[in-house]
UniProtKB/Swiss-Prot annotation:
<keyword id="KW-0068">Autocatalytic cleavage</keyword>
<feature type="propeptide" description="Removed in mature form">
    <location>
        <begin position="405"/>
        <end position="432"/>
    </location>
</feature>
<keyword id="KW-0732">Signal</keyword>
<keyword id="KW-1003">Cell membrane</keyword>
<feature type="disulfide bond">
    <location>
        <begin position="144"/>
        <end position="296"/>
    </location>
</feature>
<keyword id="KW-0449">Lipoprotein</keyword>
<comment type="function">
    <text>Acts as an axon-specific repulsive guidance molecule in the retinotectal system. Repulsive for a subset of axons of the temporal half of the retina. Provides thus positional information for the temporal axons invading the optic tectum in the stratum opticum.</text>
</comment>
<keyword id="KW-0472">Membrane</keyword>
<dbReference type="Pfam" id="PF06534">
    <property type="entry name" value="RGM_C"/>
</dbReference>
<feature type="glycosylation site" description="N-linked (GlcNAc...) asparagine">
    <location>
        <position position="96"/>
    </location>
</feature>
<keyword id="KW-1015">Disulfide bond</keyword>
<dbReference type="GO" id="GO:0030509">
    <property type="term" value="P:BMP signaling pathway"/>
</dbReference>
<keyword id="KW-0325">Glycoprotein</keyword>
<feature type="propeptide" description="Removed in mature form">
    <location>
        <begin position="30"/>
        <end position="149"/>
    </location>
</feature>
<feature type="site" description="Cleavage; by autolysis">
    <location>
        <begin position="149"/>
        <end position="150"/>
    </location>
</feature>
<feature type="disulfide bond">
    <location>
        <begin position="126"/>
        <end position="207"/>
    </location>
</feature>
<protein>
    <recommendedName>
        <fullName>Repulsive guidance molecule A</fullName>
    </recommendedName>
</protein>
Amino acid sequence: MGRGAGSTALGLFQILPVFLCIFPPVTSPCKILKCNSEFWAATSGSHHLGAEETPEFCTALRAYAHCTRRTARTCRGDLAYHSAVHGIDDLMVQHNCSKDGPTSQPRLRTLPPGDSQERSDSPEICHYEKSFHKHSAAPNYTHCGLFGDPHLRTFTDTFQTCKVQGAWPLIDNNYLNVQVTNTPVLPGSSATATSKLTIIFKSFQECVEQKVYQAEMDELPAAFADGSKNGGDKHGANSLKITEKVSGQHIEIQAKYIGTTIVVRQVGRYLTFAVRMPEEVVNAVEDRDSQGLYLCLRGCPLNQQIDFQTFRLAQAAEGRARRKGPSLPAPPEAFTYESATAKCREKLPVEDLYFQSCVFDLLTTGDVNFMLAAYYAFEDVKMLHSNKDKLHLYERTRALAPGNAAPSEHPWALPALWVALLSLSQCWLGLL
């Protein structure tokens, strides 16, 4: 942002979307994120807000406030909503905006001629691999993927099946944040799948502006939340780019300035996520104590893990598709163990953990799209994983006792950050 009358206000809204998007309400009908996106689209091109532009900014603020009022009934108690309302009031005061006046819908920022999407002369710092010329060794890449019921492959090639209902951080480092929201596949079931995905690319030097990407069930956009397809107006903006591979089903995001490739798919009703990222970027965190708070690095909390291998063995022994234990209700009888294995073998001939995940998902959901999710997840591994000898992962040779969760070195305590956020939410509500 430039130094203008609105620099302080716009600085606030550089931070606010990160906070709002990383910690949204769980499966809430509140539409505050839509209001945020509309406001950003209306104001993101205003690098300098002089006095002559203040009326236009006030119009955008009134439209923002009007949007929040329309969704107020469904946002009661929502931290993101109350934070936005409080921020709007502050900006109204700072810019001497009247609450009465035009509230036309925010206009989408149009890209100028010769937009940076066409630039190929990005600075070297905006190309991660080129910047490695000063190092003796090439970067070491890692992979993380989330798909299906959901199944997680971490940056360290640990494979887990998790419940993790609600909003969970997948990645959180100095360059980007990724959060998923998982919802129950069947009413009353502990089996969940990813219904929403938010990716925040943080502003980086002369390369990219902050960009937010959001996908939900039945909505896989081929653009960022502000309508753009690259990193904005900076000289190296072409180092961040979205490409649509299959309309409404498959997009790829290239973030060359951090050597990162992200693949997002919609398979059936649910989303899958896969990323290739340098270890240096994975470990780039300011607070080392909070490094373990995201799933791609440390995996799921112990109490959120499902021992699907024991479940699979139980189904094979009984010869019928039926969950064991009070926390896993009976699924539709669409597949037996034999028919599920036969179906999965059509796409996944190697009986590795992707194959076993496929069988598990068919037995627990009866939805054949979960077979495709496992298949595409493995296809993404083949494209993104740097070690071709580690594409297939297999179950442990040591069997787990029925009812035991998958092993973990340390059970998780409630992260201190979440406790702080809970306290903060109470503070906001007390002020409003």
